[in-house]
């Protein structure tokens, strides 16, 4: 259990700190403040609250990375590389769901609030829309996506090393 918590903390806090730093550097260096991809005429809530969206992805990554490194700690060679790539791709898809819900919550804060049963339908719509479009918005977020993919790969590889290390008493 301690090892699982250690890996989750390492992946979650490490990825959030590094992804936030990468965002901060890119946002301040010539990208006109546009680090993330967006649809034409899309409300830019991810520009108003970037660290919330980064946190959603990072802690989804921490959960999937911890699960993957814990279940198959001794995967090696090309299988490990493929497995790490799979964890990162799955993270994008899985994080798109809560990311869509968060976008819908920010939409409600902007004045588009619904009541009663429609509230839950709107959140479900946000989850479905996030799953449909989140991966594409991630692809449009170049070079942020590439830098974070490389960092995520290295962090996950280290998570595998932590998971495969002999237990200390």
Tell what function each PLM region has.
Residues 1-169:
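Juxtamembrane/disordered regions of integral membrane proteins
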